[in-house]
Curated annotation (Swiss-Prot):
GO terms for cellular component: carboxysome; cytoplasm; membrane. This is Bifunctional protein GlmU. It is an enzyme of class 2 (transferase). Mg(2+) binds at residues 103, 224. GO terms for biological process: cell morphogenesis; cell wall organization; lipid A biosynthetic process; peptidoglycan biosynthetic process; regulation of cell shape; UDP-N-acetylglucosamine biosynthetic process. UDP-N-acetyl-alpha-D-glucosamine binds at residues 7-10, 21, 73, 78-79, 140, 155, 170, 224, 329, 347, 362, 373. Its EC number is 2.7.7.23, 2.3.1.157. Catalyzes the last two sequential reactions in the de novo biosynthetic pathway for UDP-N-acetylglucosamine (UDP-GlcNAc). The C-terminal domain catalyzes the transfer of acetyl group from acetyl coenzyme A to glucosamine-1-phosphate (GlcN-1-P) to produce N-acetylglucosamine-1-phosphate (GlcNAc-1-P), which is converted into UDP-GlcNAc by the transfer of uridine 5-monophosphate (from uridine 5-triphosphate), a reaction catalyzed by the N-terminal domain. Residues 227-247 are annotated as: Linker. The gene is glmU. Homotrimer. Its main location: cytoplasm. Pfam families: Hexapep, NTP_transf_3.
Length: 450
């Protein structure tokens, strides 16, 4: 059996944030959610999160994950003290305990699997994850004997000059035989500079300690401040871009674009500079996004272009052109072959196939049929100060420039609205609707007496 414990009790003082450190966002998910996801493929029998600082907030954020046990560490007195809180929780448990850190979010699933499998194959009491760092300053050094066993872990400040030349470091991630660990946990001492209980000290107490070296040291980067958060974001973003480039997506300027891990792309998608995708985006084949666009929880069909525009929680069909400077807001549903042009905003509306809203319009709480042509400056006046009302426009209708449709109102099929009209009443199929003051021209106005 396998139990996973994630250490998530720390304050994260150096983040200088009201948000607990483990809830800081990284490419669309919190740090601790990424850590939990990295171990999901192991299908652990128990998953425990050791919480402390703002425990209620952490539990509330993660409650939806399910099958997650929360263990309170109060006060927070070191990593060894955190794992001691599992003694009553895992009473009678037989198997391995995998200990992960809630602020180390770049671990790959295959690295964790390698650690657990290596531990099981070696029959060790503990197997720790190690990394060779170009600059190991500040890290504890791991020393290994000829048989591959860990002979010692020496903190940086205690290393001799010769020992400092060793760049094999302790990543602080462990796989234990739980029964062996449970015997030594009560023996931990606070006899150290910080007066805390260190989980690292258990390694020297256990008869057989082994290690597995991580291939990519970036995987064990911890996060203690905003700079390190940004560095990890950069690493993760590069991973995501590399993955999708291998799947047939073109990034014109990769470093200027950001993705969420929940994005999915078809083939031959081109992403122009300064384009950002957040949340769960689904992008079809042959789309061109950007430059300078933001998509969030958006679903696009194939052959869609988005130029200098924002698409949030909207659905877009095939062959649609969006922008420049358009804004599709939540619940906008744009059918195949539409054109959503310059400075157009669409909110909570359905736009039928082949319809065009080319310039300077607001379409809100509306339903447009197929092949509707919305003239420049057409506005659906949907709000009466208390409630929102719907506008319905039938197939093949067209509105002239600078028209106002005051909802609730329905225009039938093949209706024409004269330019500059304010329409307040329903219009039947095939009709011409004009709602504007009669033009009055007064001759000689410029020459009138002062």
């Amino acid at each position: 059996m396998l139990a996973v414990a994630v250490l998530a009790a720390g304050k994260g003082t150096r983040m200088k944030s009201a948000l607990p450190k483990v809830l800081q966002p990284l490419a669309g998910a919190t740090l601790v959610e990424r850590v939990l996801a990295s171990a999901a493929n192991l299908q652990p029998d128990r998953r425990m999160l050791i919480v402390g600082h703002q425990a209620d907030r952490v539990e509330e954020q993660l409650a939806a994950i399910g099958l997650l046990e929360f263990v309170l560490q109060q006060p927070q007195n070191g990593t060894g003290h955190a794992v001691q809180q599992l003694l009553p929780v895992l009473q009678g448990f037989e198997g391995e305990l995998l200990v992960l850190n809630g602020d180390v979010p770049l671990l790959r699933a295959e690295t964790i699997e390698s650690l657990v499998n290596g531990h099981r194959e070696s029959g060790a009491d503990v197997t720790l994850l190690t990394a060779r760092l170009e600059d190991p300053t500040g890290y504890g050094r791991v020393f290994v004997d000829a048989d591959g066993k860990v002979s010692a872990i020496v903190e940086h400040r205690d290393c001799s000059e010769e020992q400092l030349s060793n760049n094999l470091t302790n990543a602080g991630i462990y796989c234990f035989n739980w029964q062996a660990l449970a015997e030594v946990l009560p023996k931990l001492s606070t006899d150290n500079d910080q007066g805390e209980l260190y989980l690292t000290d258990t390694v020297a107490m256990l008869p057989k300690a082994m290690h597995v070296e991580v291939a990519d040291p970036d995987e064990v980067n911890g996060i203690n401040n905003r700079k390190q958060l940004a560095q990890c974001e950069a690493v993760l973003q590069q991973r995501l871009r590399d993955h999708w480039m291998a799947e047939g997506v073109t990034f014109v300027d990769p470093g200027s674009c950001t993705l969420s891990e929940n994005c999915c792309f078809g083939r031959d998608v081109v992403i122009e500079p300064q384009t950002h995708l957040r949340g769960s985006c689904r992008i079809g084949d042959n789309c061109r996004l950007g430059p300078g666009s933001l998509l969030e929880n958006a679903e696009l069909g194939s052959d869609v272009s988005v130029l200098h525009s924002v698409v949030r929680e909207a659905t877009v069909g095939n062959g649609v052109a969006i922008g420049p400077f358009a804004h599709l807001r939540p619940a906008a549903d744009i059918a195949d072959g539409c054109r959503i042009g310059n400075f157009v905003e669409v909110k909570k509306s359905q736009v039928g196939a082949g319809s065009k809203i080319n310039h300077l319009s607001y379409i809100g709480d509306a339903s447009l049929g197929e092949n509707v042509n919305v003239g420049a400056g057409t506005i659906t006046a949907n709000y009466d100060g208390v409630r929102k009302h719907r506008t319905v426009i039938g197939d093949g209708s067209k509105t002239g420039a600078n028209s106002v449709l005051v909802a609730p109102v329905t225009l039938g099929a093949k209706v024409t609205v004269g330019a500059g009209s304010t329409i307040t009443k329903d219009v039947p199929d095939g009709a011409l609707a004009i709602g504007r003051a009669k033009q009055l021209s007064k001759e000689g106005w410029a020459d009138r007496p002062a």
